[in-house]
């Protein structure tokens, strides 16, 4: 397979568009100390990192694009897509968000 996994896509976007280096894996991105923790979905802003998982463990990351939606790579080799943050598969798996200082 070629392409991006979820954290690879997020890292690529932040590195190439903003010159910001992020940790390589989603779990480490979710604990990035210099990124503001956002717990309430209503507080999200475009560009925030959104994290998903189960049983308290982060296993997926995307970038919030507004209007309750986020862009992400479902898995390596799959097309990058935009999905709902509030309904469907991802709605029940949202855990937190982080706002990276730009």
Outline where the language-model segments fall.
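Catalytic cysteine-centered active-site loop
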Residues: 1-46
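Aromatic- and glycine-rich peptidoglycan recognition patches
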Residues: 36-40, 58, 65-102
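Structural motif
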Residues: 47-48, 68
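Conserved hydrophobic/aromatic beta-strand scaffold that supports enzyme active sites
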Residues: 49, 61-63
